[in-house]
Every structure is written in structure tokens, then in C-alpha cells.
């Protein structure tokens, strides 16, 4: 597990804890921060399931996974060999977001059931937040640029159309760098408007994208 996971864990836990601290009706004291830490751990479990889904599809395609490394905004599965066809690339890439959207649906159902049963806000609030974060992670990962899953989907489609893997890879990498620049610009905007937490988030995402594109 890459050391950068500590950064995202602290940011996730603090962000949600701060949100709960300001939420009307939520218990005070240590409750917001403890709940934030627990929710952060569940969030990381969701990221791990996202990556395991890639690994599962890879193994079904006859490709072994040496290890999975969690990074600041997801993870990277280290494969024993390169993908052999656009079809396998597409299936492996789309598996992660699909699982993430399924998790969002599960948390959404739990949120509705718990809320209608008048369960404590200590339990209900994290469910709602996990719906939002999984939808965000799923949607973000579908952006068409490396190293995101959407970039691999784009590469698979270009690879199939042109028959040139190197050309398809280059196009997906450039797209990833362009996306990183726009995300970084959004981060600067948030800093200028004194929304520092969002600014940090977006700048970290931009750096992550650009370095790995």
C-alpha cells in the first residue's frame, strides 16, 4: 500500500468529521471525528473492492495479478503481462467503475431503509456520504484519460478502431494530461475563493493524474 494512502485517509476522515460537526442534530464531542475515521476506513474498503474487480476480470482473461497498490485516488494492479486484446482491456477497465456504482446503490438502499426506520443520524449520515463518494469516484474514474479507467476504455476503443496500441496509448495519455490541467485549474480557483479543503483535493488529484498519465 503506497504511503500516499495516509494523506487521503486523513483528508477523508477530517472532511467527513468536519461535515458532521456542522450537521444539526449530530452528537457533539468526539462523535463526529470517530465517525469520520470509521467512514474513512469503509471508503478505503470500497477502493479496494474497485481494484479487486479489475483483478478478477484480469484473471478471468488469463492474466495474473502480482500485487495491488493503493494510491491517493484509487489503485494500480500490477499485471504479469500486457493485455492481449481491446476487448480484454475494455472489460478490465469498466469492471472497477461498475462495482463502485453497485456499491453506491447498496449504500443508497441502506440510507433509505435506515432513514425511514428512524435510525440514529450517527448511522444514517455515513450511508448518505458513502453514496455520494462512490458516485463521485465512479464518475471520476470514467473520465477519458490515463491513468483513469475511462482512459483505458478510451485506449481500448482507439486500439480496436486503429489496430495500433502505441498510438491509442499516446492519445489516452495526452487526454489524461489535459484533464489534469483542468482539474488543477479548478483547484487554484477554489484556493482563490478560500475554499481551501476543495483546493487541496483538486490539486492533489491533478498532480496524481499528470504524473501517471
Regions found by a protein language model. Name each.
Residues 1-213:
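Hydrophobic transmembrane alpha-helices and their immediate loop junctions
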Amino acid at each position: 500500500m503506497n504511503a500516499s494512502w495516509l494523506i487521503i485517509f486523513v483528508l477523508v476522515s477530517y472532511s467527513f468529521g468536519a461535515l458532521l460537526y456542522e450537521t444539526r442534530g449530530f452528537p457533539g464531542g468526539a462523535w463526529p471525528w470517530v465517525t469520520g475515521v470509521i467512514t474513512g476506513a469503509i471508503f478505503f474498503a470500497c477502493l479496494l473492492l474497485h481494484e479487486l474487480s479489475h483483478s478478477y476480470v484480469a484473471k478471468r482473461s488469463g492474466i495474473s495479478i502480482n500485487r495491488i497498490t493503493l494510491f491517493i485516488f484509487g489503485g494500480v494492479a500490477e499485471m504479469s503481462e500486457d493485455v492481449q486484446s481491446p476487448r480484454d482491456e475494455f472489460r478490465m477497465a469498466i469492471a472497477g467503475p461498475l462495482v463502485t456504482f453497485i456499491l453506491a446503490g447498496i449504500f443508497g438502499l441502506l440510507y433509505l431503509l435506515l432513514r425511514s426506520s428512524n435510525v440514529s443520524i450517527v448511522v444514517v449520515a455515513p450511508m448518505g456520504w458513502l453514496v455520494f463518494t462512490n458516485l463521485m469516484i465512479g464518475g471520476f474514474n470514467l473520465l477519458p484519460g490515463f491513468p483513469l479507467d475511462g482512459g483505458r476504455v478510451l485506449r481500448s476503443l482507439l486500439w480496436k478502431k486503429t489496430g495500433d496500441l502505441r498510438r491509442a496509448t499516446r492519445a489516452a495519455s495526452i487526454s489524461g494530461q489535459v484533464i489534469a490541467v483542468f482539474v488543477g485549474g479548478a483547484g487554484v480557483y477554489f484556493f482563490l475563493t478560500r475554499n481551501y479543503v476543495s483546493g487541496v483535493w483538486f490539486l492533489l488529484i491533478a498532480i496524481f493524474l499528470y504524473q501517471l498519465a
